Structure formats: C-alpha cells, structure tokens
Amino acid sequence: MERFFENAMYASRWLLAPIYMGLSLALLALTIKFFQEIFHVIPNIFAMAEADLILVLLSLIDMALVGGLLVMVMISGYENFVSQLDIDEGKEKLNWLGKMDSGSLKNKVAASIVAISSIHLLRIFMDAKNVPDNKLMWYVIIHMTFVLSAFAMGYLDKQTRH
C-alpha cells in the first residue's frame, strides 16, 4: 500500500508537464503581441515624438523580459520537477540547463520581476505629469517591495548554501 502511494505521488509530477506546455502557449501569445506592437509603430515611426517611441521601446523590452522569464520557468521548472531534458548532442544547448535548482530559479525569477518592475516604473515616470502623486508613490513602494524581497531571497539563499 505504501509503495503504491509513493509511486502514485512520484508519478503525479507529470501533471505539471501540461502546465509548462501551457506556458509555451503564453509565450506564443506574448510573441504575437510583441509583433503587433511593432506593426502598429512602423507606419507612425516618422510622426512619433521621441518620448512616445521610447515608451514603445520600453514596452517591447518589458515583453522580452517577460518572455525570458517564461522560458526560464518553463524549462528549469520542467527539469527540476518533472524530468530531465534530453537534448540531442548535435543541437544547441542552453548553458544553464541542468544547473538551475529551485533556489536559484526563485532568485532569477525575483531578479526578472525587479527588472520588469523597473521598466514599468520607468514608463510611468516618462509620463509622470499625467499620473497623480499618490499613485506614483504607490508604484515606487510596490517596486521597492519587489527589490527588497529579491534582495532578502538572495541573502537567505546565500546564507543557507554556506
């Protein structure tokens, strides 16, 4: 009976596989939105103000960071919790494959969230004249919460590894 439960629990990790595959669909949706934004900008590129172009570029950078975060969570999550990836020898292999445990994944996710939040905050500051002061304050507080959380997670991870 015990063996059955242990085997069933171990096999249940495969329930995560469709979730990680679903993240690849989210990446596809993000890619579509990325190119939709580019196709929207191209006809207006010469008429756009520099500040507006910078806002669009920050939005594209934001999407690229989110895409990288999705890939990192998909691949390393699959490797850590479901099964090791078997990449053919002749194919290009990401240098961090097999090296990122759940602790380092959490730190990378936290760092990515801080980077994404920084880009978002920069976009807000570019349009600060149209944003009420109390909203700006809350954006900064939320961003600092992300920064402090990422710092604390990294510090705790470093302390537990040594």
Swiss-Prot record:
Localization terms from the record? Cell membrane
Q: Where exactly are the transmembrane stretches of this chain?
A: 15-35, 53-73, 136-156
Q: Which keywords label this protein?
A: Cell membrane, Membrane, Transmembrane, Transmembrane helix
The terms describing its cellular component in GO are: plasma membrane
Q: List the disulfide bonds.
A: none
What InterPro entries does its record include? UPF0114 (IPR005134), UPF0114_bac (IPR020761)
Identify the main location: membrane
Q: Which domain of life is it from?
A: Bacteria
- Record's bilayer topology term: Multi-pass membrane protein
- NCBIfam families per the record? HI0507
Family under the similarity heading: Belongs to the UPF0114 family.
Name of the featured protein = UPF0114 protein PSPA7_5214
